[in-house]
Amino acid sequence: VSVVGTVR
């Protein structure tokens, strides 16, 4: 989970 909020 990145800072942008993606599942990645």
Curated annotation (Swiss-Prot):
Official protein name in the record: Uncharacterized protein IMPP2
Source organism per UniProt: Nautilus macromphalus (Bellybutton nautilus)
Top-level lineage group: Eukaryota
Tissue: Nacreous layer of shell.
